[in-house]
Amino acid sequence: MKAVIPYKKSSAKSRLSPVLTREEREEFVDLMLNQVIDTLKEAGVGTIDILSPSMYGLENMTKANVLLDKNDLNEALNGYLEQAEEPVIIVMADLPLLSPDHVKGITSTKEDVCIVPGKGGGTNALFIKNPSCYRVRYYGSSFLTHCSIAEKTGQSVEVYDSFFAGTDIDEPEDLVELLIHGSGAAKEYISKKFRLEMSRGRVGLVHI
C-alpha cells in the first residue's frame, strides 16, 4: 500500500484570505502537509508520494517522494492510479485532524473502496484496493461521484464516517475546529494568530 497527497503551495487556500495573508496561507499549508505526512508514517504507510504541479515549497522535502505533474488534479491522479501496482490511499493535504488510527481504519476496510466524505460533498480521502480499475473525479459533489464510479465498475464501497477525518480546512470557520480539536504544528501556528471567542452562543475567531 502507498499514499499519494495532491499538493499545491502557490496561492493556496484563497478562501482563508479574509483572515490570513498569502504568505501566512502558504506557511500554514506547508505545516498541514507535513502533519499529514507524519500521520501516514505513524500509521505504517511505507511509501508516500506528493503529487504537485510545481516544486515550489517542496525543494527541501525529504519525508516523502515528490512527483511533478502539471496536468489538472484529476488527470494527474488518474495517471498515478494507472501505474499503481498496489492499493493506494489518496489523502488531501489539509486534514490536520486526521490521526494514524483513522488511516488504519480506512485502509483496513473489507470493501474494494473506502471513501472519507468531506464538507459540502467533497472527498477527503479515498482508499482504492485496485487502483488500475478506478478513476477519480474531484471537484463538485465528488463524494457522490466517487460512490457512483465504484458502483459502475462493480467495486464495493465503505463510507468512513468521521468528524475529524471529514474536517478539511478551507474556510475561516474551519480554523475554529482546528483550535478546539487539533494538535501539532498546524494548530500551534493558528493559535499564535487567533483565539476563540463566544458570540451569540457560537464560537468564533478573534485576531490576537
Swiss-Prot record:
Enzyme class: transferase
Signal peptide boundaries: none
Stored InterPro entries: CofC, Nucleotide-diphossugar_trans
Keywords assigned: GTP-binding, Nucleotide-binding, Nucleotidyltransferase, Transferase
Enzyme nomenclature, EC number: 2.7.7.68
GO annotation terms (biological process): F420-0 metabolic process
Pathway field: Cofactor biosynthesis; coenzyme F420 biosynthesis
Reactions catalysed, as given in the entry: (2S)-2-phospholactate + GTP + H(+) = (2S)-lactyl-2-diphospho-5'-guanosine + diphosphate
Molecular function terms, GO-annotated: GTP binding; phospholactate guanylyltransferase activity
Organism domain of life: Archaea
Family annotation (HAMAP family): CofC
Quaternary structure annotation from Swiss-Prot or TrEMBL: Homodimer.
Function in brief: Guanylyltransferase that catalyzes the activation of (2S)-2-phospholactate (2-PL) as (2S)-lactyl-2-diphospho-5'-guanosine, via the condensation of 2-PL with GTP. It is involved in the biosynthesis of coenzyme F420, a hydride carrier cofactor.
Family to which the UniProt record says this protein belongs: Belongs to the CofC family.
Name listed for the protein in its UniProt record: 2-phospho-L-lactate guanylyltransferase
Organism annotation: Methanosarcina barkeri (strain Fusaro / DSM 804)
